[in-house]
Amino acid sequence: MKLFKNTFLVLFFVGFSVHLSSQPRTTDKIFSSESKILVISGHPNLEKSKANKAILKELEKHFGKQISIRRLDKLYPNYQINVKAEQEAIKNAGFIILQFPLYWYGTPALLKKWIDDVLYDYFKGNRLSGKFKDKAIIASVTIGGSKERYSPPNKTVETYLIPLQETFEVIGAGWASPVYSFDAVPSNKNLSETAFQHFVKLIDLINEHKSVADQGCW
């Protein structure tokens, strides 16, 4: 069954490769000022995190009842994702923030499992149509390395996020500019300020999309 599942996803994404190349790489959906915000926290052990935990705390304080944070490490310590519960959470969200540390140039295993299980369930039941049409995906990433490490001639953060971007674009979601911070390690004496500035960038990005939508410019 696992082999079939993986093969199915690969074939689906390959089949849409031509379609992807012609699609815009920015959000082109409509989001109102009342759009709900769903945060999927993909850190495998948030209690030991400083940057990710601080960012989530600021988001919760700022948005209050408008935001819902799902801590995958608390909900699924055994990696057994409750797909129906996750799809219910997705249903009313206008913005979906994927909050995670960059591990080996990708998402942590728990977040990858969430993506695989939740999206595959839509595919196998042929129930994907329209589910992500009016949703913006924001990759909010903390990075342990320095800015120089992810600057030309090296590969950029955006390059490492392409698989994630194309995964969500192929299902019809909007892809907002990612928000990321460097030097997110305990040895960084300015880590609290780094996390706060990351939060500010997230707020600015969300407000920008809401403002444009309210003006009817999309």
Short names for language-model regions:
Residues 84-165:
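Helix-loop-strand module that forms the ligand-binding subsite of alpha/beta enzymes
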Residues 65-78:
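A short beta-strand-loop structural module common to alpha/beta enzyme folds
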Residues 27-65, 181:
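N-terminal beta1-alpha1 ligand-phosphate binding loop
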Residues 31, 36, 60, 163-218:
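Glycine-rich phosphate/pyrophosphate-binding loop and the adjoining helix
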Residues 76-84, 187-194:
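Structural motif
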Residues 30-32, 128-134, 171:
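Short, conserved loop/helix-junction motifs that constitute active-site signature segments
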Residues 1-27:
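Bacterial Sec-dependent N-terminal signal peptides
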Residues 38-40, 70, 97, 138-140, ...:
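Hydrophobic/aromatic beta-strand patches that form the interior of the parallel beta-sheet core
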